[in-house]
Amino acid sequence: DGEVIGQQFPSDTGPIDLLAVSKDESELLVIELKRGRVSDVVVGQIQRYMGYVVSELAEENQTVRGVIIGLEDDLRLQRALSVAVNIEFYRYQVDFKLFKG
């Protein structure tokens, strides 16, 4: 209904790609979008953004989670995420076709 539910959000650690609030407002979701293969470096990046959200935006009763979205991951990213709290990785798939006429 015209309500913005996720958008790029400025922080003191850099711009957060998307910051979303759950319908019941119990959760803030930091979303980092990456093209192609995702490096383990992004784990530190999203943790900085999540730290900003915890310190500056979240209320006591709100949970802060992170989601990394990319085309593919690798073993280093999997290892880093295995010990990262409240961060998940999702793969996207693009099937783009162009037809003349």
Could you tell me what each predicted segment is?
Residues D1-G101:
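Charged, terminal alpha-helix-loop-beta segments
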